[in-house]
């Protein structure tokens, strides 16, 4: 398939270099986030008059089809593609033709991958937080049922003082409460949308970054384009 970069070069990229740069082996896990981000980007482009309503509908239908086929196993993500972005774009063009080539208007793979990573991390945080919440509920139940269940407390592997099972379990309850707080803090810190940052300094297209951020559930857009595409913390 054609590369999404390399217009200045006349010779084909050496296979070793191509394989070294390829990220499909690990960023294929971002396929849902990549498609979600693309749908929001396309909705914004249409709202700004950069795409027609017909083009928007075509692209969205194509993206929905790709998502459904990957989920069902009908479509496989292979090493033929350099990264998840090229996989989605190539399959979209195969499905809907030239309209698919407009998917990347006003966007770089730099701000796109930054978005994918943020969406993925946020999804993982939310999933983990829900699991910790259920764990805390289970621990709470054990504590309530064992207020008068006595056991030895240990220091240095030696029996030291009597405690209740509720108190013992309560120690872990407090630890996991702190873990939930840390997850919430991470989510708050990273919940800004990098789309619109472009390769490093934005774009001349009249994008509405606030609208894209809103569609994707972010608190707002990132404030500095260079930070947006270099931020991996």
Region roles according to the model:
Residues 1-202, 206-215, 219-220:
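A helix-coil-helix interface module used to build multimeric assemblies
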Residues 216-233:
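Acidic, glycine-rich loop-and-beta core segments that form the ion-binding/anion-interacting portion
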């Amino acid at each position: 398939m054609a590369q999404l970069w390399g217009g200045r070069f006349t010779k084909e990229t050496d296979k070793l270099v191509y394989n070294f740069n390829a990220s499909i082996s690990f960023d294929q896990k971002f396929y849902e986030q990549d498609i979600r981000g693309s749908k929001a980007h396309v909705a914004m482009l249409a709202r700004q008059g950069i795409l027609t309503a017909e083009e928007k509908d075509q692209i969205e239908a194509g993206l929905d089809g790709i998502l459904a086929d990957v989920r069902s196993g009908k479509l496989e993500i292979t090493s033929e593609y350099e990264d998840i972005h090229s996989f989605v774009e190539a399959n979209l063009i195969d499905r809907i033709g030239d309209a698919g080539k407009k998917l990347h208007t006003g966007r770089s793979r730099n701000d796109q991958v930054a978005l994918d990573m943020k969406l993925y991390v946020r999804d993982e945080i939310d999933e983990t937080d829900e699991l910790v919440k259920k764990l805390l509920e289970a621990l709470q139940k054990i504590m309530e049922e064992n207020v008068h269940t006595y056991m030895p407390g240990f220091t240095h592997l030696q029996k030291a003082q009597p405690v209740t099972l509720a108190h013992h379990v309560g120690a872990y309850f407090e630890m996991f409460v702190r873990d939930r707080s840390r997850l919430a803090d991470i989510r708050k810190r990273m919940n800004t949308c990098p789309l619109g940052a472009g390769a490093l300094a934005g774009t001349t297209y009249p994008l509405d970054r606030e609208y894209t951020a809103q569609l994707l559930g972010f608190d707002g857009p990132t404030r500095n384009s260079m930070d947006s595409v270099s931020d991996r913390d």
